[in-house]
Design a protein with these regions (language model features):
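Phosphate/dinucleotide-binding and metal-coordinating scaffold of catalytic cores
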Residues: 1-429
Length: 429
């Protein structure tokens, strides 16, 4: 005779600033979201798959929109293993991790235990010496170890949510919100050296070419760290407002494990369908795809696209996580797989003008306009890449590090040079 075991239910209250959205439940690994009546009448849907008019959304055995949505707030891969081990929680227990790290998760939502209240906003100074010690403790301990606020940020890399105010780093406490994301160099320095300056260079290059990107900078503590201003925050210091944003997986109701597998022109069109300005957004997505091709970014997946909610609907957020992965695969980087195929091309070296035109057409951009955008971006990118490299080498932007300078030259005269040549062909023959 089977013995029935009653599984305890767990609950978290979901907040956006001072507004209560509802309750998140989990029992027997099945999740449910119950909207607060006030939010149901006056708020907005957390995502297209979580409509307010349903009142309560319950996951099933195979379709789990609630779990997929909230799981996307947590770190991935090794980052999740590390914060879970540091907290003494099983990495497979996503709800338990949200209970622990919900007060400062990725995005704008705050997840609190029933009745829990956060202390008033406060900032604690984060000295360069303390930050350096935390970096040196990687990967044994996460960067958030010792932080006054339990924090969890989505993604696979080590990162820390901080406040940058007049050149000083601070850590948020209580109701205080972070303004910047901080990343050190990749822990596997032999395989991925100088990732900080790599991302800084590619983000600055994107901005110089007219792509929307947030402010970025490099700080040395003395280890280099990359700082990027959060596009989902407004204000400074203790007066920061959270803006609601979703990444591509959340907007499409996909588990994070599908961020590569489901990347296609079809999913881009599905994202376009929910934006308030699809014509503007499809051109922005075309430029984003072309830029990632030119720098050799083989990690431009669905979670690296985000959308901000406004009064009139969803709009594409500024770009982030732009870096050259190809520079670490030289000299045969052309065999790297494109995350979003272009036409029939699935590898970087297979891309031609014809394939780029086909990709543009597949997301609704006419071939002629696609090729005009290609020509403009190619011209701007080559000019700006050389100018930014020269500025770095002359010490205008940073104190020159020989290893960093060598990597930046490899990006410009490796992947960028190769990709520009491939994109100038009409065919592979």
């Amino acid at each position: 005779m089977a013995i029935e075991v009653e599984v305890e239910s767990r609950q978290l209250d979901v907040w956006l600033e001072q507004q209560r959205i509802g309750e998140l439940y989990e029992q027997g690994n099945l999740w449910a979201l119950h909207y607060d009546p006030v939010w149901r009448d006056n708020g907005f849907d957390l995502s297209p798959a979580l409509p307010r008019n349903a009142g309560e959304i319950q996951d099933g055995g195979s379709q789990r929109p609630v779990q997929w949505f909230f799981d996307n707030l947590l770190p991935e891969e090794g980052g999740r293993q590390l914060v879970a081990a540091d907290a003494g929680i099983n990495a497979a227990d996503a709800f338990g991790l949200l209970q622990r790290f919900g007060p400062e998760s990725a995005g704008a939502l705050t997840l609190l235990s029933p009745g829990q209240q956060l202390p008033p906003p406060e900032l604690r100074s984060l000295s360069d010496a303390e930050l350096s010690a935390r970096i040196q403790a990687l990967p044994r301990q996460p960067l958030s170890h010792g932080a006054p606020k339990r924090m969890s940020l989505a993604g696979a890399q080590h990162k820390l949510a901080v406040v940058l105010e007049q050149g000083q780093l601070w850590e948020p406490i209580g109701q205080a919100a972070s303004t910047h994301i901080l990343k050190p160099d990749h822990e596997q320095v032999d395989h991925y050296p100088h990732s900080v300056v790599n991302e800084w260079f590619c983000m600055r290059l994107a901005g110089a070419c007219g792509l929307p990107v947030p402010e970025v900078q490099v700080r040395r503590v003395p280890e280099p760290v990359y700082l990027v201003r959060r596009f989902d925050r407004e204000g400074e210091g203790l007066h920061v407002r959270r803006r609601y944003a979703l990444d591509g997986c959340q907007l499409l109701s996909l588990d994070a494990v599908f961020k590569y597998q489901q990347a296609s022109s079809l999913t881009l069109r599905q994202l376009l369908d929910v934006t308030r300005t699809p014509a503007v957004t499809r051109l922005a997505l075309l430029r984003w795809q072309l830029f990632n091709f030119f720098i050799g970014n083989a990690d431009a997946h669905l979670k690296n696209l985000s959308f901000l909610w406004g009064e009139k609907g969803w709009e594409l957020a500024p770009h982030y996580d732009l870096l050259s992965t190809a520079v670490y695969r030289a000299p045969d980087w052309g065999i790297e797989t494109l995350v979003f195929p272009m036409g029939s091309a699935t590898r970087f070296a297979d891309v031609t003008k014809a394939e780029i035109g086909a990709f543009g057409q597949s997301i609704g951009v006419p071939v002629r306009l696609t090729l005009l955008e290609l020509e403009r971006l190619a011209k701007d990118l080559w000019r700006e890449a050389q100018a930014l490299l020269q500025a770095y080498e002359q010490g205008i932007t940073h104190e020159v590090d020989p290893g960093e300078a060598r990597l930046l030259r490899q990006i410009v005269y490796g992947p960028i040079t190769d990709a520009l040549a491939w994109a100038s062909r009409w065919s592979r023959s």
